[in-house]
Amino acid sequence: MNGSLDHPDQPDIDSIKMFVGQIPRTWSEDQLRELFEPYGAVYEINVLRDRSQNPPQSKGCCFVTYYTRKSALEAQNALHNMKILPGMHHPIQMKPADSEKNNAVEDRKLFVGMISKKCNENDIRLMFSPYGQIEECRILRGPDGLSRGCAFVTFTARQMAQSAIKSMHQSQTMEGCSSPIVVKFADTQKDKEQKRIAQQLQQQMQQLNAASMWGNLTGLNSLGPQYLALYLQLLQQSASSGNALNNLHPMSGLNAMQNLAALAAAASATQATPTGSSALTTSSSPLSVLTSSGTPSGQPAQSAWDAYKAGSSPTSSTSSSVNPMASLGALQSLAAGAGAGLNMSSLASMAALNGGLGSGGLSNGSGSTMEALTQAAYSGIQQYAAAALPSLYSQSLLSQQNVSAAGSQKEGPEGANLFIYHLPQEFGDQDLLQMFMPFGNVISAKVFIDKQTNLSKCFGFVSYDNPVSSQAAIQSMNGFQIGMKRLKVQLKRSKNDSKPY
């Protein structure tokens, strides 16, 4: 169907083929032409029909092509979500057809930064007009109407935009700007969504820093003072190695070690004391000193150390039997305060113990168990340091893990294999591997892909070389929010059991 005689045989090179939905199934091409022609000369209308019926019936949608791009955009602005046709319940849907996506606005739109605030739209158009026809030029302005020093420029073709980037990016430094001009493709909606998710993930990882090491100590409530002593031993050894965090108070590691010693002494005294009383009194307890926020930096540790040297006694009638392991959470104030930076290795060892003590095999205080406990602590240093303090942990250590695990489907021992639901659509094998590496040695990480669409099914498997790591991952990552959903992390079903764990 050709248009009127005052038009060429073909539409303009930048014309758009539009898809139109929510039209009556009884309408013919002539009726549709009457609908579209008020906005410009129509080159072609093609009603989509169901060929399985005889005669073929309209599907209630069509394609329309105007001679000019301007006419198509005017029709879209006037009709899309604006007009409801007779017999229909929803407004017309009008948008560029899928075949036009290769010339979508996002592929032709440039962001221009570091421009002089004295420039107006005409100046920017003049600057970019040598590279092709400009469809739109807009300077970003604040509430006061003043330029923010950046703009969006949309060309009619992607090649023009690419030429502008190649010639203009960092080609000059404009008046009042500290850096050369920036010319790049503007962020698409997908780019913005990915940035939002990444920012949200970073914030949640920061929250995880505190929770992953201190919030998970509740499972250790039944353990005795020998484990406190081991914490102290690990802290002493790591402090003597000189592997302390930079930019923190030099005495903070010693302070933490002294406080742990006081805690260990108090815990020992607690077990030696009858049930009715406790060495951890409200008046002289090292814990009460530890949690005091009004004391200047350095003094809490010294006070606790003095209490340890002098010995604690149940002098208060309101003695409480505070659980020594649960009370370890008081050390969080040391790690969070300005004067309290625990040695990195000691934090890692403590976090490793936190994961290692959760397994059923480490339930008594025998010598062999203590040796196994120490081994578990040191083997987990790198893994759990990344989980507890990712912002302070060297990324090079993470890269030492077997990156080839991404995409493989190798299974670990019983209880070391995880099933992860609600993964973001854009997550791949490598993303899954990076997310679960901090909790242990990952031997495989696989996101499942739909073979027909080649898109993620939003679930996957992760396998560790030991069950302790998988439990630590479940404890920290189950319920972890990414975007609008929360991850669901659980053990993979046993080969010998049809029911989940």
Swiss-Prot record:
GO process terms (BP): cell migration; determination of left/right symmetry; developmental cell growth; digestive tract development; embryonic liver development; endodermal digestive tract morphogenesis; lens fiber cell differentiation; liver development
Domain of life: Eukaryota
Coiled coil: none
Name used for this protein in its record: CUGBP Elav-like family member 1
Species annotation: Danio rerio (Zebrafish)
Keyword Nucleus: yes
UniProt lineage: Eukaryota, Metazoa, Chordata, Craniata, Vertebrata
Record-level Gene Ontology MF annotations: mRNA 3'-UTR binding; mRNA binding
Cell compartment(s), UniProt: Nucleus; Cytoplasm
Chain residue ranges for the region called Disordered: 274-323
One term under GO cellular component: nucleus
CDD domains listed in its UniProt record: RRM1_CELF1_2_Bruno, RRM2_CELF1_2, RRM3_CELF1_2
